[in-house]
UniProtKB/Swiss-Prot annotation:
HAMAP family (UniProt xref): GmhA
InterPro entries hit by this protein: GmhA/DiaA, Phosphoheptose_Isoase, SIS_dom, SIS_dom_sf, SIS_GmhA/DiaA_subfam
Source domain of life: Bacteria
Cell location: Cytoplasm
Stated family: Belongs to the SIS family. GmhA subfamily.
NCBIfam families linked: gmhA, PRK00414.1
PANTHER family the record matches: PHOSPHOHEPTOSE ISOMERASE, SEDOHEPTULOSE 7-PHOSPHATE ISOMERASE / DNAA INITIATOR-ASSOCIATING FACTOR FOR REPLICATION INITIATION
Annotated GO CC locations: cytoplasm
The keyword Cytoplasm belongs to this UniProt entry's keyword annotation: yes
EC top class named in words: isomerase
Keywords from the named record: Carbohydrate metabolism, Cytoplasm, Isomerase, Metal-binding, Zinc
Quaternary context: Homotetramer.
Name of the protein in question: Phosphoheptose isomerase
Designated gene of the protein: gmhA
Length: 193
């Protein structure tokens, strides 16, 4: 009944991943991002992560697997997803939705910390403002984007972009793979400490 649809969806997902893998710059960007994060942790820094919708879930997933565990038991790493509902509703109400992440970065971000901003379009105003706040604090910035990078293109120390122009879910599927690989590489880097 739906076998063709299922095959088409899985084939499109595989094709999106294959296209991402073709560009060697993506492999290097993932490695640079992992080393940047591990270096921050080794120096006493932390990572703040943010995004909207499914990207917000990815930001929380990233922080959870750093503070908790991924595949192996190891010490937790300092990671905070900007996901506190009371903060988001307060700032959204009092300052506007575009400020929900930047206010948090202004409050707890420090020089030497890292911001991971996730946006499939690269045009999320609240993530862009968080990047600006992170820069003002002397933080490093990593972005996970899609399509042409949108307004976030060129704003990060490391941008990992999925150049897919279809639905956002295909971009998110690559983002979660990248997040898992980042955690794996961070764990390897932290053992070197």
């Amino acid at each position: 009944m739906y076998q063709d649809l299922i095959r088409n969806e899985l084939n499109e997902a595989a094709e999106t991943l294959a296209n991402f893998l073709k560009d060697e710059a993506n492999i290097h960007a993932i490695q640079r991002a992992a080393v940047l994060l591990a270096d921050s942790f080794k120096a006493g820094g932390k990572v703040l992560s943010c995004g909207n919708g499914g990207s917000h879930c990815d930001a929380m997933h990233f922080a959870e697997e750093l503070t908790g565990r991924y595949r192996e038991n190891r010490p937790g790493y300092p990671a905070i997803a900007i996901s506190d509902v009371s903060h988001i509703s307060c700032v959204g109400n009092d300052f506007g939705y575009d400020h929900i992440f930047s206010r948090y970065v202004e409050a707890v971000g420090r020089e030497g910390d890292v911001l991971l901003g996730i946006s499939t379009s690269g045009n999320s105003g609240n993530v862009i403002k968080a990047i600006e706040a992170a820069r003002a604090k002397g933080m490093k910035v990593i972005t996970l984007t899609g399509k042409d990078g949108g307004k976030m293109a060129g704003t990060a120390d490391v941008e990992i972009r999925v150049p897919h122009f279809g639905y956002a879910d295909r971009i998110q599927e690559i983002h979660i793979k990248v997040i898992h690989i980042l955690i794996q590489l961070i764990e390897k880097e932290m053992v070197k400490a």
